[in-house]
Amino acid sequence: MTQFASPVLHSLLDTDAYKLHMQQAVFHHYYDVHVAAEFRCRGDDLLGIYADAIREQVQAMQHLRLQDDEYQWLSALPFFKADYLNWLRKFRFNPEQVTVSNDNGKLDIRLSGPWREVILWEVPLLAVISEMVHRYRSPQADVAQALDTLESKLVDFSALTAGLDMSRFHLMDFGTRRRFSREVQETIVKRLQQESWFVGTSNYDLARRLSLTPMGTQAHEWFQAHQQISPDLANSQRAALAAWLEEYPDQLGIALTDCITMDAFLRDFGVEFASRYQGLRHDSGDPVEWGEKAIAHYEKLGIDPQSKTLVFSDNLDLRKAVELYRHFSSRVQLSFGIGTRLTCDIPQVKPLNIVIKLVECNGKPVAKLSDSPSKTICHDKAFVRALRKAFDLPHIKKAS
């Protein structure tokens, strides 16, 4: 499979903002930590036949580097420090950190190496996999079809929100990792820029070129790694929250809540954390139940929920976002991050449900035990039991 061998990626910044935010924190706090991560396809797609084509793209990624104009743009943002950006200028992807294989039709990918380097592979590699698969599966699909679908959805959206005060509705593009293609994502984002409620993108390359606000804070891996970095497993989530505030004391303050379930998170999210963090992000479980828990938690701590932001980003589309907005908009600030339903929404095209997740830190297991049992990831059953015990969790069925 080499007829589509041209590089998918053209910029080191063609990634999600939180990857650079986390990379800087790792660079400053955990320079010598090593990790391993693995690819998962949550669907029944047999993607192993694309292994050779993906391996070619991985090799091509070693030629990406931070360009001078990109460096200058990042330097003007308020949260990057000079030592990190100077290091990032020298950064190159190392393909030796990635193994790609076809395991009886199943695509196997494993990443390993220093966390400060491995952390940048996930998002662009997923985008590469998604685009390569769609090139082969759906050669007839194009940008025009994606735009037509969006225009139709926007007509429905206008009807759905007629008479509704939309002044507190904020939508972000979170669609890099599972996009149909780079071109489709850019076209969709350019169209959404025309809407007053569209506030930014998680993609740093698009944010720079289209003069948009880059959006993102931290991901599950930040909390997962602390399960082995922290000497006390039961304190690992608090350690992760505290370390983030050391790096970003006054900004990038949206905390992800579902690495070890929302209930366990809230037990760790005391008044100091709740006061200093600007808000919370939902990424699994029932969104209404989650939002009600978040608001009740703030109220219990004596914090006005109106001063905080809830970000919803789990499997959203425009209709779901409006339903959540109607439910919560009078009580708390809101933002909505939509990914696949914007950047891979084309008739006859099946989006991929693919992830790359941390599985080890410093040679020891880490786990994600989210509010959606199907998203649970860990090889080591004994560690999962230890994690549940440390965080006083009820039994959660492990995903197969």
Curated annotation (Swiss-Prot):
Assigned GO CC terms: cytosol
For this protein, the record's NCBIfam families field holds: NAPRTase (TIGR01514), PRK05321.1 (NF003704)
For molecular function, the Gene Ontology terms on record are:
nicotinate phosphoribosyltransferase activity
Q: What is this protein called?
A: Nicotinate phosphoribosyltransferase
Q: How is it modified after translation?
A: Transiently phosphorylated on a His residue during the reaction cycle. Phosphorylation strongly increases the affinity for substrates and increases the rate of nicotinate D-ribonucleotide production. Dephosphorylation regenerates the low-affinity form of the enzyme, leading to product release.
Q: Which lineage do the record's taxonomy fields give for this organism?
A: Bacteria, Pseudomonadati, Pseudomonadota, Gammaproteobacteria, Enterobacterales
At what positions is Phosphohistidine found?
H220
Annotated gene: pncB
The biological pathway it contributes to is: Cofactor biosynthesis; NAD(+) biosynthesis; nicotinate D-ribonucleotide from nicotinate: step 1/1
Instruction: Give the UniProt keywords, A-Z.
Output: Ligase, Phosphoprotein, Pyridine nucleotide biosynthesis
